[in-house]
């Protein structure tokens, strides 16, 4: 092999190695930032991966919010109409958080099936609900199809 071909082969291999490393780094970064959405039914059935950051949403069950007196710890149950899961959170809840309200929590499921949230989001006005939560509630029959005006929740 003459020196020109050797040099060209070395350059092509170096470029391929660089592109391979860049793709591997990009995929690694994307995998760490993907937060898949799971319904309470899926989490209760064990479909959510333990220890991986996920999003879960539904309606906060009436009478399920338990606060501690000496810290910012709060535990509550979220339902999609079929199943309910417990979510624990350490921090100040959003102003719009209340029982019967749609929420999305970001966190990790522990070995007990409890979602340990590091972020809780409440819907920001009376007409908005995250699409995933809306679909899960419609599927379970807890929410009638939205046709303008106020959303109605089945009791």
From Swiss-Prot:
Entry-linked InterPro entries: CcmE, CcmE-like_sf, NA-bd_OB-fold
GO molecular function: heme binding; metal ion binding
Stretches that traverse the bilayer: 9-29
Disulfide partners: none
Sequence ranges on the Cytoplasmic membrane side: 1-8
Keyword Nucleotide-binding: no
Keywords: Cell inner membrane, Cell membrane, Cytochrome c-type biogenesis, Heme, Iron, Membrane, Metal-binding, Signal-anchor, Transmembrane, Transmembrane helix
An example Gene Ontology biological process: cytochrome complex assembly
Keyword Transferase among record annotations: no
Compartments (UniProt record): Cell inner membrane
Family: Belongs to the CcmE/CycJ family.
Function summary: Heme chaperone required for the biogenesis of c-type cytochromes. Transiently binds heme delivered by CcmC and transfers the heme to apo-cytochromes in a process facilitated by CcmF and CcmH.
Protein name as it appears in the record: Cytochrome c-type biogenesis protein CcmE
Species the sequence originates in: Stutzerimonas stutzeri (strain A1501)
